[in-house]
Amino acid sequence: MQRSLSRTPPIAVSLADDESSERVARISLKHEQTRTNNYRSTTSTMSTLPSLLVVTSLLAFSNVFKCFHVFARDVDYCFADEDDPYLYMATKTAYHFVHGGKTRFQTVPNCRPVQMWMLATYGTRCPTLEEINMINSLTDIRDQILHNHETRGVGHMCNRDLDNLKRWQPDEYLKPHRAEALTPQGVEDMKLLARRLQSNFPELLQPFTSNISSSNYKFRANEAQRSMESFMEGLFGSRNAVVPEESFLNDTLLNAYKTCGVWENDEHQQSYENTEYDLFVVGPIFQNLVHNVSRRLGFLYNISSDRINAMYEACRYEKAWTVITLSPWCAVFNKEELRILEYREDLNYYYKAGYGREINARLGCPLLHDMMQHFWNIAHDETSNEPMGIFYFSDIVSLQNLLTTMGINEDQTPLTAFTYKDMAKRQWRTSLISSFAANLIAVFYKCNDSKDNNKVMFYLAEKPVQYDGCLVGLCDWEFLKSKFGQLASNCKLDVCWIESGAPANLLLNSIAIHFVCFILVLLGY
């Protein structure tokens, strides 16, 4: 700090000449007056010095506080201290947070359950191999984030969040050989689901040991074998209690979409499925998310969407694996950003497997037909050889196809890239309809009702489905027959091959090639 206490430089006076003594006297007097004035100025300055020091100290402390405040995290909150974290992580949501089994299923007066039909997805599992590689690569950006905060003094994460991130190491579930394997939480998901169902429907699911057989309980799984076994163990105490039906690679019941050329064709998906998703990703809402996350982590440029995706995958997988702890990577996002990421995935599946494409409603038809056929048999003859429980295990696309066919959780307004703010209360939320261990359960009842003694109750994630035309979720069988009967009895998947697009062209090209070859053979070539 410069101070106004510097002395007046000495005045050079030459006495070599023969100037008069009067001039010398005048100069000496002027010099003395200057010194006197400087002394007075110095005295005045010294008298105000304590006040100046106080003000200067306050300013310096303020600057230090500002620097410290920025380092501590100049954002809304510290995630490590969050008492109410956002738990809805789209298709990677832990079933523990969304199922309705915390309360008992409602009792249907004057009715008894006679059959249960269920389609469930796999429980909490490890990432795919591609996702494992993506999450494991986060160690590099983690080190950059720490460097940004600790060395460069930029970034806005709080110290506790940084400490948690510093201690983070890739989990054992991120080993390549564990790809898509069921985790202990996934095993628990399925066991507890089975036990809750058994507790709510003892007439169906608490049989004598001699009645536990494949004729009374039908099991079938495709790509969810261990989930099925865990459910069976929770139900009957053994993973091998019932011999399941064999499932084939091209299973048109449990995975109809995988046998559909039009659905899988990249060009067809690009034209229908990805347009709204891509528009949302390049739009202002998502790009603002990328910008804010990048600055929060201390980057002066926008990090790539791949990095955003990797951090989001780490956040939601780790939360699903261990429901009682928080993932350090969730601290990267605030609640609104997690809602945006959730909507992005909802948008993707809306067109991939839901109401965004007409073909998806066709692909859920085989499962609807199977359910209706079982109920039809038992409605006409309760003494038929129908099993008491039918339990299928597949993936979220097949479940979403079935929900679409049945019109469950359909919004009046389609989801688009531009409706995020308008669809906060949307029905199509993958967090709630297709989390880990998601399920649709239908229970057929025989009732003492003069009007219709056959009724059906639907449960989605163990919560009653509120169907128009049904009473608090309880549907008359005659109503369901009129609603689904014609559709379920006419499940044609020829749409997968005759619809315009690459698969149809491929078929025509194949016929043309075979015809040309046939002609060449006839001509002797």
Whereabouts are the PLM-identified features?
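Compositionally biased, intrinsically disordered low-complexity segments enriched in Pro/Arg/Gln/His
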Residues: 31-33
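Signature for phosphate-centric chemistry
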Residues: 67-501
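A positional/structural detector of protein chain ends, strongest at the extreme C-terminus
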Residues: 1-3, 48, 521-525
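C-terminal GPI-anchoring signal of eukaryotic secretory precursors
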Residues: 43, 496-513
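Phospho-regulated RS/SR low-complexity segments
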Residues: 4-8
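N-terminal signal peptide
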Residues: 57-82, 519-525
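Transmembrane alpha-helices of multi-pass eukaryotic membrane proteins
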Residues: 51, 115, 217-220, 392, ...
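Acidic, serine-rich low-complexity intrinsically disordered regions
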Residues: 15, 20-21
